[in-house]
Structures are given as C-alpha cells and as structure tokens.
C-alpha cells in the first residue's frame, strides 16, 4: 500500500472561539486627539492614546511551531506562550492638532474639600473653572491672582470663610485657596519653578484630608500670590476637573516632557504649639444661651519639605518650602439677648 504522512491542522473555528475572550480582554480602541482653541484659551483638550490588540496570525504561527510542526504525536498538555500585543495608532495624533508642544501630562495635583459649606463648594468650582484651559507660554511666569482677577460678589463669588485680619470671617470668594493649593501641588509634581508661594496663617483641615501638612498655597489679592514659571521650552496647558461625588479637585498640567525627574520629600514638623484655650464672647444679637462658632482651633507648627528636580542626572532645582503656622483659637459667640 501507499504510506501517506498525516496532515495535521487546527480547527479554525474552535481556535477562534478560544482566542476571542482573550482578544476582547486585551483590545483597546485608539483615541484621537482633541484640541480646540478659542479666545486665547483651550476650550477642549484630550491627548491621543494608542490602542492595542493581539496578533492572531502570530499566535497561530507560534502554536504551529510549538506543537504540530515540532512533534505532532505528542502535543503538550500544559504549554504557555507569550501573547503578542500590537499597538493601534490613532488617526489623529496630539502632534497633528497643535504645534504648541501640548503633548502629554507632565504633572498632576489633587485635594479634597469634603465638609465644605455649599458656598465654598460653589467658589472652588467657579475659581477652578476660570483657570481651566489657560496656556502658559515658554518662559512666562504664571500668576494665579492675575489669572483669577477680581474675587468678589461682582464677579460671581459667594461668601464663605476666609482668613482676614488674623481672624476667620465670612468673605467673598472663600475657598479659592483650595484652587491655588491644588495647582501648587501639580506644579511641584511637574518640576516647574515656584517663583512665589505663601502658606496659610494656620493649618487648614481641608488641605490635610489627603496630604501631609505644609503642602498648601494661600492667595489674597493683590499681595499674596502663587506664581509658577514655565521653563520647559514649550507651552503648557492647565486643566482642572472636579469629582462632584468625592468633592475632589484635580489640576493637570500638559506640555512636553524634557525628562526631568522630581523628588518631593516628606514634610517634617520641627515644632508644635497647642491651640489657645477656647474664647467665648458675649453677643447681644443672639438669643440667650445660643452658641455660634466663628473661629476654629488649630495647633501651631513649623513644617518644611524639600523638592529636588533633576535633568540629565544634574540638579536643576532644589527648593525648601517652609510654613510657620500660628496656633489658632476657637472662638464662640455666646448669646445674651433676652426674649
């Protein structure tokens, strides 16, 4: 008789059934870039993202070489292969939609403002929206106070607690320091030079909900400012985002990475001072016996942290940020008005 060698092959349908869940779990659509520039402000931006999928043909070829072609009579029961993942390029890349150097995320900062009163939440939302989409040119020093402009009821702000004249009082725009604090954190992480930064007079609980003490930045127009320099050689884009469920503010800074590496040290508390005893002040406008808290206790502390920025293994920025927080007294108004 004629001795014909057997012809081995895979059942294509069964192989496709096996590989389909694997492909579905790995597949990711590419994302086209979005960049809209109107009235000197970026109104919409999304960087392009590569997608990914698996190379089915390469998997089949590997299986053939590892099994049927190698030893058709002894297919291994347990065998592993590396899944070849290939990149899918978007049709519209970030480089195609702008020539300003806005390519990638170079720094991000976050903060929580849970337990804020309604007006404070409103002010944080308003102020952060007014910084959203700002472009900072190469070599430019960005001023938060200048960018926000007038902070008052005339520009849409509501009354919430501010630090003024050594007291915590209701004032227009209470909460805007949440915005400057969060942008400060983003600039720190981006490795940008901090030209001016001022701590708060006392430790504010909002800024320590998800952060150690000392990483805050106060602003108070016109003299207390946060200033950041763009030394990257390309434009940078500031974007803000609020998660309404978590009451979390995020600032993202986009630009062109030049490979700088940032190391931020853990804040160190070198001394602490207990808060003064609670003060009660008689108030004839409040019903007798009623208490109203108008200032909140906070221990004093001296805090510092360092930041080192390296590029090509050389230190290009070395800062120390120091905060001297005063001990703060809780104050209650005590009603004396007779019915």
Predicted regions and their residues:
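Short, compositionally biased low-complexity segments
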Residues: 1, 31-42
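A cross-kingdom signal targeting lumenal/periplasmic-facing segments of multi-pass membrane
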Residues: 1-23
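Short coil/turn segments at secondary-structure junctions
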Residues: 2-6, 47, 164-167
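Well-ordered beta-sheet/strand-loop patches within structured domains
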Residues: 17, 21, 27-29, 36-38, ...
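Short, hydrophobic beta-strand segments
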Residues: 42-50
């Amino acid at each position: 008789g004629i001795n014909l060698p057997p012809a081995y092959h895979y059942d294509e349908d069964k192989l496709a059934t096996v590989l389909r869940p694997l492909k579905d779990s790995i597949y990711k659509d590419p994302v086209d870039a979005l960049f809209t520039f109107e009235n000197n402000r970026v109104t919409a931006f999304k960087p392009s993202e590569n997608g990914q999928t698996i190379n089915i043909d390469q998997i089949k070829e590997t299986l053939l070489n590892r099994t049927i072609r190698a030893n058709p009579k002894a297919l291994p029961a347990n065998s592993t292969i590396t899944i070849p993942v290939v990149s899918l390029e978007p049709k519209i890349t970030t480089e195609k939609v702008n020539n300003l150097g806005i390519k990638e995320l170079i720094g991000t900062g976050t903060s929580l403002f849970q337990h804020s009163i309604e007006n404070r939440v409103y002010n944080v939302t308003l102020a952060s929206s007014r910084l959203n989409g700002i472009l900072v040119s190469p070599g430019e020093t960005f001023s938060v106070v200048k960018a926000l402009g007038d902070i008052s009821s005339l520009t849409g702000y509501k009354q919430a607690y501010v630090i003024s004249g050594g007291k915590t009082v209701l004032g227009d725009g209470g909460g805007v320091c949440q915005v400057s604090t969060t942008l400060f954190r983003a600039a720190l992480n981006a490795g940008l030079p901090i030209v001016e930064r001022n701590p708060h007079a006392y430790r504010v609980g909002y800024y320590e909900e998800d952060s150690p003490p000392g990483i805050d930045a106060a602003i108070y127009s016109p003299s207390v400012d946060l200033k950041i320099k763009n030394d990257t050689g390309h434009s940078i884009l500031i974007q803000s985002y609020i998660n309404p469920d978590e009451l979390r503010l995020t600032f993202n800074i986009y630009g062109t990475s030049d490979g700088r590496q940032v190391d931020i040290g853990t804040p160190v508390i070198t001394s602490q001072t207990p808060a003064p005893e609670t003060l009660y002040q008689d108030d004839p406008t409040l019903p007798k016996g009623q208490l109203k808290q108008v200032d909140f206790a906070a221990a004093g502390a001296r805090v510092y942290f360092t930041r080192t920025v390296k590029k090509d293994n050389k230190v290009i920025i070395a800062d120390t940020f120091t905060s001297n927080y005063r001990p703060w007294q809780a104050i209650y108004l005590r009603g004396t008005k007779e019915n």
